[in-house]
Amino acid sequence: LINMSHPEGSPLAFFPPTYYLDLRFSKEDWNQGKTMTLEACAAGHAFLDLYDYTGEQMYYDRALGIADTYLRLQREDGSYPIKIDFKTGEPVNEVGAMLHPLLNYILRLHNQYGITKYDIITEKGEKWMDEIAVETFNMTGQFEDVNVMGLEPYENLTNCTAAPYASYLLNKETVSEKDLNNAIDLIRLSED
């Protein structure tokens, strides 16, 4: 994983590829040379788990390197593109990623390790989720087996984004009335 990830100083520093080798979805034209933006969160969690277990600093440093790249990639409005070019880091379209994986990753860095440097990701990300994704109920699926090129709003709805964000909202240290109401609406959307 480390050897396949982007080196420090590159546009996607420390990000591993979503698509590699000769696997089924790696062969799809729409995935070649691309990566799902939020897939690096899973690698970040894995590096933190390895650090917790082994105490080896390099794993902790890689996890923070991934968070640093997310800090740099966040758009002014708090959003992230769903998929990006793996070499340049440029978005392949304007479809926004649903941010629950990233928000949970940043929450872990804050709660378990006391790191506050990335809290701005949470602040801006929650604002975007609430004002755009939740407000419009455009909870776009984040599946690599779907071509996101030309994806229209509401074309790829799924409970796999609505339900996890509802869970994130309900598991916050302080759940506001707005968080609760949004979570209830998202759960209802998931049931439909």
Q: Where are the model-predicted features located?
A:
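Glycan-recognition and catalytic cores of secretory/periplasmic carbohydrate-active enzymes
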Residues: 1-192
